[in-house]
C-alpha cells in the first residue's frame, strides 16, 4: 500500500484521507512542513454558465502561470499538466495556451521534451502524471454572483472517482485556479458525492490537511507520540527545534529535527523500532 508517485505526501493526502481510508503509506519529505497543494483564488473570475460554459479570467491566469514557469530556468525542467473540470474550458485553454506559446517562442520548451505539456479534462486524464499539475475548476459565480451546484461530470454517478483520479496526478506541486472558495458550495442543496468532494478539495487547497470540509471517520489522529516525543524533548535541551509524529498517513517519522538554517525544512529524521523501544 505504499504510494510512490508524489514526491510530497501532501499531494496524495486528500485522496488518501477522503477515498482510501488513510490506508496508503506515504513517506514525509524534507520539506514536509509546507503543503505542495495551493489555491490560486481568481477573485474576478466569472463562469459563463448560460452561453460559452467557460471561465476566461481563470484560463488567462493559468496560461500566464504556464508561460512564467517555462521561461524560468529553475522551473522549466519540471513537466506540466493542465487539468480542467469541463471540456469547454479545456478547449479554451488549449487555444489560449497555443497562442501564448507561439507568441513567446516556447513551443519547443513545452513540447520537445520527454513529458510534453498536456491539457486534459477530469474525464480523460487517468493514466497521466506530471511534475506540476495546474487545475482550472472553471465553475463558480456567474455575472449575477450566483454559484450553481451543477458541476458537470462531478454531479454524475461516480463523479467522485473522476475527482479522485484528477487530484492525484502530480509528483511535485499542484495549483488550483478557482473562482470560488469551498464556502460557496452549499452541501445542504445536493447529495452528490462528487460535489461534496470538490468542496473538500477546495478547502484542502485553501487551508491544508487538517481542515477538510468533510470529516473522514477513517482518519486516525496520533494520540501519544511514543518515544519520538521524548527524543524530541531531549534534543530540544541541546538547542534543536524538533517535531514528533511527522507525517499525514499511518506511517510516521518518530522525530524530525528542523534545519536551523532553513526553518521550512527538516535536517534529520529519526525512526524507532517501536513506540516504546
Residue locations for each model-derived region?
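Conserved helicase/translocase motor-coupling segment
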Residues: 22-101, 225
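Catalytic centers of nucleases
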Residues: 248-257
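Conserved coupling/interface region of RecA-like P-loop/ASCE motor cores
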Residues: 1-29, 85-87, 168-169, 179-186
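Conserved motor-coupling elements within RecA-like helicase/translocase cores
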Residues: 105-133, 140
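Helicase C-terminal subdomain and adjacent C-terminal extension
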Residues: 1, 16, 144-246
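Short beta-strand-loop-alpha-helix junction that forms the active-site gateway
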Residues: 256-277
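Amphipathic alpha-helical transducer elements in NTP-driven molecular machines
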Residues: 5-8, 12, 59, 63, ...
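Short glycine-/polar-rich loops that comprise or flank the Walker A/P-loop
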Residues: 34-37, 129-132, 170-174
Amino acid at each position: 500500500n505504499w504510494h510512490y508517485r508524489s514526491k510530497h505526501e501532501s499531494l496524495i493526502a486528500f485522496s488518501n484521507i477522503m477515498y482510501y481510508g488513510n490506508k496508503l503509506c506515504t513517506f514525509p519529505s524534507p520539506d514536509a512542513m509546507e503543503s505542495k497543494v495551493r489555491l490560486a483564488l481568481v477573485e474576478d473570475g466569472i463562469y459563463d454558465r448560460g452561453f460559452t460554459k467557460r471561465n476566461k479570467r481563470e484560463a488567462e491566469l493559468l496560461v500566464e502561470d504556464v508561460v512564467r514557469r517555462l521561461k524560468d530556468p529553475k522551473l522549466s525542467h519540471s513537466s506540466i499538466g493542465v487539468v480542467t473540470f469541463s471540456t469547454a474550458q479545456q478547449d479554451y485553454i488549449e487555444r489560449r495556451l497555443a497562442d501564448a506559446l507561439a507568441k513567446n517562442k516556447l513551443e519547443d520548451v513545452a513540447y520537445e521534451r520527454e513529458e510534453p505539456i498536456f491539457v486534459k479534462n477530469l474525464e480523460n486524464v487517468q493514466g497521466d502524471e506530471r511534475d506540476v499539475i495546474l487545475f482550472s475548476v472553471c465553475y463558480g459565480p456567474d455575472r449575477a454572483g450566483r454559484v450553481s451546484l451543477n458541476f458537470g461530470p462531478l454531479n454524475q454517478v461516480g463523479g467522485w472517482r473522476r475527482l479522485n483520479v484528477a487530484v492525484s496526478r502530480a509528483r511535485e506541486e499542484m495549483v488550483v485556479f478557482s473562482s470560488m472558495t469551498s464556502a460557496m458550495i452549499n452541501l445542504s442543496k445536493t447529495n452528490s458525492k462528487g460535489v461534496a468532494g470538490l468542496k473538500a478539495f477546495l478547502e484542502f487547497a485553501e487551508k491544508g490537511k487538517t481542515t477538510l470540509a468533510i470529516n473522514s471517520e477513517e482518519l486516525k489522529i496520533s494520540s501519544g507520540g511514543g518515544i519520538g516525543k521524548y527524543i524530541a524533548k531531549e534534543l530540544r535541551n541541546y538547542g534543536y527545534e524538533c517535531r514528533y509524529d511527522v507525517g499525514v498517513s499511518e506511517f510516521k517519522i518518530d522525530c524530525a529535527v528542523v534545519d536551523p538554517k532553513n526553518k521550512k525544512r527538516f535536517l534529520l529524521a529519526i525512526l524507532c523500532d517501536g513506540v516504546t523501544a
